[in-house]
Amino acid sequence: MQAQPIHARLMNGEVLSQDDATAFMREVMSGDMSGVRMAAALAALRVRGETPEEIAGFAQAMRESAVTVKVRPRDVLMDVVGTGGDGAHTFNISTTTAFVLAGAGVPIAKHGNRAASSRAGSADVLEALGVNLDASPEVIQEAIDTLGVGFMFARNYHPALRHAAPVRSDLAARTVFNILGPLSNPAGATHLVVGVFRADLTRTLAEALRHLGAKGATVVYGDGLDEFTVCGPNTVSGLRDGEIIDRTMHPEEFGVDLHPKTAIVGGSPAENAEITHALLTGGGTPAQKDIVALNAGAALRTAGRVGTIREGVEQAREVMKGGQGWEMLQKYGALTKR
């Protein structure tokens, strides 16, 4: 008897192995799957909820189909990225954090896009800061290998996603694609801090990253934000040495004050670029400085560069005061325009 096609198995409630999930997504990425079959499968997954193995399999196929950035091997290559879709309209916290980390000497391969639910995504604000988003993969590779930082504009690195775009648009609802971007870094990031839009996703994505071979990861839901928040508790799943630990973290544990959500709201790309510039040159408001320091501190701990998040927060504050992150951003912007 002929085996059922994967989309039919999903519609029947079957859970896929990681290999079968990869096979399904390869068919999507190749353009060989009809829109009806794709929509049925995505809807079935949405209703049931994706397993870590399925998410890892889908992400593996996305990685295979991506344009890659062939950086030299290293022990740590970090991405700090959110799924987007939190609707909080904050300034560009993860983008600012990435350059603080680069200023602290952590190699960064940031992967991002234009705005999902805010007015300015990472690509929008970096463009406003003078970065050429369309720099070639070879230029990005050179930037990561020589400067220690690079930004990959997702649209340019995942051309096969065009095959899923019409169905995603027609469904007009979140699907597994909304969480795959952070898991599909074209440079092969080894360590990640991933922000998610629902608390129940932290463990799921940490397990998926373990299946994908990540050396270290921190997945966080920040009380309504897809990053660490300074406005309330953080739901965190941390992957270290193959073990995953779930916990709730409060900003005060790390020497960071609590602030209202209104204190971290952003605006247009130009307005957010001004905030990023201020923070990377020792300025910014207390809330802005605290939330970037907390996110950078957690990333420094994830990368193994400090023993505790509190130590990381203090190091991040020193980098912001010293302007090393801004220096990195200026050098990177110039390199992308060559």
Curated annotation (Swiss-Prot):
One of the protein's GO biological processes = L-tryptophan biosynthetic process
Tell me the SUPFAM superfamilies matching this sequence. Answer: Nucleoside phosphorylase/phosphoribosyltransferase catalytic domain, Nucleoside phosphorylase/phosphoribosyltransferase N-terminal domain
Q: Which residues form a coiled coil?
A: none
Chain positions recorded as Mg(2+) 2 binding sites: D226, E227
- GO CC aspect terms: cytosol
What catalytic reaction does the record list?
N-(5-phospho-beta-D-ribosyl)anthranilate + diphosphate = 5-phospho-alpha-D-ribose 1-diphosphate + anthranilate
Give binding positions for anthranilate 1: G82, N113
Q: How is the cofactor bound?
A: Binds 2 magnesium ions per monomer.
Q: Which Gene3D superfamilies match?
A: Nucleoside phosphorylase/phosphoribosyltransferase catalytic domain, Transferase, Pyrimidine Nucleoside Phosphorylase, Chain C
Residues annotated to bind anthranilate 2: R168
Membrane-spanning parts:
none
Specify the enzyme's EC class, one word: transferase
**Which co-factors does it depend on?**
Mg(2+)
Q: What does this protein do?
A: Catalyzes the transfer of the phosphoribosyl group of 5-phosphorylribose-1-pyrophosphate (PRPP) to anthranilate to yield N-(5'-phosphoribosyl)-anthranilate (PRA).
Q: Which family does the similarity line name?
A: Belongs to the anthranilate phosphoribosyltransferase family.
> What name does the UniProt record give this protein?
Anthranilate phosphoribosyltransferase
Gene from which this protein is expressed: trpD
